Amino acid sequence: MEVKSLLMVMATLTIAGCSQNEMTEMNPDTNRTIGLDVYTEVQTRGTETTTSTLKANAGFGIFAYQTSSAGWNSEKGNTTPNFMYNEHATWTSDSWGYTNLRFWPIDDKKITFFAYAPYESKPEVGTDQKITLSGQNAKGAPTITFEVKTSNNWKDMIDLVTDCHTAIQDQTNESNKGTVQFKFSHVLTQIANIKVKPDVNLGTDTKIFVTGLKLDPGSTTLYNKAVYKFDNDTWEAISPDASYFSTEQDLSDFLNKTTTDQWGYNKSSINVSDDQNATALFSDTEALYFIPVNNKNGTTNAGDLKLKINYDIVTKVTDTSNLTSTITNKEVSLPKNTFKKGTKHTYVLTIKMNAIKITVEDNMEGWTDDSDSDINVEK
């Protein structure tokens, strides 16, 4: 099916508003086409969703609801996405386009828009992005049932963005200049990086290497699946039973580890020995994305979420041998008010070293006097 310029055409539309069966004829010569423009509120990197990644990848999905002049707030409880449902917007030929062209109503009807990204082509089951959309016949603002993707060592995670701003509600032929301006916001929480450093200068003969990392989510703190509501831009538990991460999540294979030979030590690891500049455990182009805890509030208490880190302290013996001290599951409590919606977090972990210190008393213990010994020298 040909993708037309984000201004589309459909001569006959089914309108579900005050009358679910109302039919409105639209003439392409008198109705202006609806155009689109896109902006992501927070410019981000790598696997994050940005305007650039929207253009290059799957694009985004649009919901549009037509109401009478009374507007969205008055009629949303009885209105379905009758104007557009999961309409796929893509970037082609230097402009945004979509397949089923729509025109602005010429009367006082109003159009309210919602959008999300990345696009899910199977919205009833969420096969592609783990995004399941509310149905085409569902009344009121749409919802997304979202499941955190943990496949491919956490590297398949997606950065869900949405637009539910009031600026794209109750649009009319008179008030709109032809183009709908979508402004997406990040609705997950991002772990941008975890960085590690020692608290002292290790010198030249000691190194620290991080070998593993786990997230301890508690039992009822961190959703692995939840419902996002466009109506109030919040997350809530799925029904009837909330779904949480309830066991430790091993993030070790997500880390940006390498293998080098250091005095015979050659584990896959990350050298975090610099005490002046904390070393990142993640690649520059990757981050972790989770459903936020308590929306914009984050965790209630310090330690509601914890990290567990594994590392080796390696001391040189010769150029080809070493002494290694292995520390496993060193627990770090994350602060309160973390994992907030729309916020990216970087955690800097400082390893406290117990250096062996040497002191010398200025006044040595006195000599013990011994008695004179008579020694005979034989001729």
From Swiss-Prot:
A lipid is attached at C18 (S-diacylglycerol cysteine). Transmembrane segments: none annotated. One of its GO terms (cellular component) is cell outer membrane. Pfam families: Mfa_like_1. The keyword Protease does not apply. It is found in: Fimbrium; Cell outer membrane. This is Fimbrium subunit Fim1C. The gene is fim1C.
